[in-house]
Amino acid sequence: MTQRSLAEWLAYLERLHPSAIDMGLERSREVAVRLGLGRPAPRVITVTGTNGKGSTCAFIASLLRAQGLKVGVYSSPHLLRYNERVQIDGEQASDAGLCEAFTAVEAARGDTSLTYFEMGTLAAFWLFERARLDVAVLEVGLGGRLDAVNLIDADLALITSIGVDHADWLGDTRESVAFEKAGIMRPGKPALCGDFDPPLPLLERVAELDSPLFLRCRDFDLSVNESGWSWYGLTAVGEVLRLDDLPLLDLPMENAALALQAYALLDLPRDAEKIADALQATRVTGRLDRRHLNWRGKSLTLLLDVGHNPHAAQFLAGRLQARACAGRRLAVFGLLADKELPGVVTPLLADIAHWAVTTLPSERSRPAAELQAHLVSRGAHVEAHGDVASALEAQCERAAAGDEILLFGSFFCVAEALMWLERYAQEDVQDGNAG
């Protein structure tokens, strides 16, 4: 059989299973056994949560790599290239490596139908096992209990936050969401929770498993001032640790605090300077992602954020209010139909001078006209566009020097913006001008 390219593999995976999401571990476990998969690394950290999974995984990986450990990170979704999902020692997996992994999983699959995510998860585990990692950091795709990542018994289980999202799959209460996310815990293994008021099902699961629980505001926390922040936490034997004068971060420092608590439980060197440098160097594309653009002689700032639920919008609004803007703030906004529109836009209404709303390149997108009607009813200045690129270009034209353009609401929205920025940069070079 002719070898498939990565693009051909991904197209194949998209049509392999009748539904994009099919919760359950039975199919994946069956194929993993046939594939002969063991543990992806001697130590495994699994991360779930309504918000903050990606940045928490990135902080943990940075902290571990600063100590010379070889770390694999599995995350989703990707923004531009599938390779983003599988990182080994700070580098994205190669096309050739992913194709080899998909070939191995396909050979083991037989007649067992797997979803796109399940195939990708098993392929990542296959690559990690061969990379001889020290630590694997695994980000749950959806929920936790029935997510393919949960095939692996985690040494540390992290729950970043608990809010209502993906209600069709996880339920429409914090209690139902907590039950699903608590499914990543294992008997006697430490569990960490960044939500300082976890719902009862999570606490019941902790008691049932006799797992040590490290809870924010009780066992670890942070305090922030104008020049930096401090953290305290506990070691596995209950020793109190403290770090002061940590640098302020663009990414959520609450997630850095959770990552530090995970690090404290691994009994690794505690060089304060290395820790501070690792945190400050952490970047996550599409999360409070600041880009500078010269548009027709105007110096503009773009802020890209994949936040798409009320909790994420509240955090984003807080960060905008804490950081002064020389001019106005304009928005480019798109949202999927299963997301809570009023809850996402309300925290940001006071900060946005003008909205450009757009339909996203997904069958699940809310139409731009629906977004426009809602925002108009809330007294906002808004215009509708058919795609992200035209909305972004319209806001670039509207903006004056010193203005900031916030683009948020969906991974689809940020991915389209990143592709537009790539095209714009290429055209800029070809034209020999500054935009």
Regions found by a protein language model. Name each.
Residues 1-19:
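Charged, amphipathic alpha-helical linker segments immediately N-terminal to NTP-binding catalytic cores
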Residues 8, 19-21, 25-42, 66-152, ...:
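ATP-dependent carboxylate-amine ligase catalytic core
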Residues 41, 135-138, 147-158, 162-164, ...:
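Nucleotide phosphate-binding/pyrophosphate-handling subdomain across enzymes
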Residues 47, 55-72:
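A conserved segment at the C-terminal end of the G1
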Residues 74, 192-195, 207-226, 246-250, ...:
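Beta-strand->loop->alpha-helix junctions that form or flank phosphate-binding loops
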Residues 112, 134, 139, 154-246, ...:
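Acidic, Mg2+-coordinating active-site environments of NTP-dependent enzymes
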Residues 196-201, 208, 213-214, 225-227, ...:
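C-terminal helical cap/extension that packs against the catalytic core
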Residues 360-362, 428-435:
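Short, flexible loop segments at boundaries between secondary-structure elements
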